[in-house]
Amino acid sequence: MAEPRTLVLLRHGNSDWNQKNLFTGWVDVELSEQGVAEGQRAGELLAESGILPDVLHTSVLIRAIDTANIALKRAGRSWIPVQRTWRLNERHYGALQGKDKAQTLAEYGPEQFATWRRSFDVPPPPIDDDDEYSQSRDPRYADLGDALPRTECLKDVIERMLPYWESDIQPDLASGRTVLVTAHGNSLRALVKHLDGISDADIAELNIPTGIPLVYRLDEDYRPIVPGGEYLDPEAAAAGAAAVAAQGSKK
């Protein structure tokens, strides 16, 4: 039997807008002090477990890039090769980007709020190109043209993420490398949905906490040996996932 392939998923640390309870999406916001500490702890968990990444795949958003750099430095792996892609970006929240989650919940009600936030195939209203939180003039997306999202649902995230999973991440796993993917709540939910075969309905209940490595051992067909993977700090992961689920209720 072939050796299991090791995939480590890491959601970026807490960001300034996570702390302010704002919809972030593709807006490029910095880590908070808490997020920096989470990145450091993630690196310590990797080092303590002996799960040392050989290659990093991350989004082009600074909160994921910085989390990965902080974690890898703490784990003594700053030198590994890196690939960055917009396909691992957070879900684009459209016209909700920059809006307060609690205010949005109060304004539109729990049903509409839940639909925009957790529906598999219903995106929020699209963002205008001249909105201050639009990416229409961001140079990192200049080559996307009409493919630049103006809003997304989770289904859209899966459709733009899976080609990269197949073309770039799977080959690294097949070569025997331990792969670290540092990304975002929804791009990681999209990948976990694919790995674990989670239904369109059940994925709404999955929450991924910030800053805690989630380790998957995959067989030769890229199926999880342990469904759901294993967090390197299960207790902190459970508390973090509960905090993510409660977003919107905070003032």
UniProtKB/Swiss-Prot annotation:
EC top class named in words: isomerase
Family statement drawn from the similarity comment of this UniProt entry: Belongs to the phosphoglycerate mutase family. BPG-dependent PGAM subfamily.
InterPro entries: His_Pase_superF_clade-1 (IPR013078), His_PPase_superfam (IPR029033), Phosphogly_mut1 (IPR005952)
SUPFAM superfamilies linked: Phosphoglycerate mutase-like
Keywords tagged on the record: Gluconeogenesis, Glycolysis, Isomerase
One BP annotation, GO: glycolytic process
UniProt source species: Clavibacter michiganensis subsp. michiganensis (strain NCPPB 382)
UniProt key word Isomerase: yes
Gene Ontology molecular function: phosphoglycerate mutase activity
UniProt-listed Enzyme Commission number(s): 5.4.2.11
Residue ranges of coiled coil: none
Site (Transition state stabilizer): 184
Active site, per annotation: 12 (tele-phosphohistidine intermediate), 90 (proton donor/acceptor)
CDD domains, sorted: HP_PGM_like
Recorded metabolic or biological pathway in which this protein acts: Carbohydrate degradation; glycolysis; pyruvate from D-glyceraldehyde 3-phosphate: step 3/5
Protein name: 2,3-bisphosphoglycerate-dependent phosphoglycerate mutase
Region (Disordered): 117-142
Catalytic activity: (2R)-2-phosphoglycerate = (2R)-3-phosphoglycerate
Entry binding sites for substrate: 11-18, 24-25, 63, 90-93, 101, 117-118, 185-186
Functional description taken from the UniProt entry: Catalyzes the interconversion of 2-phosphoglycerate and 3-phosphoglycerate.
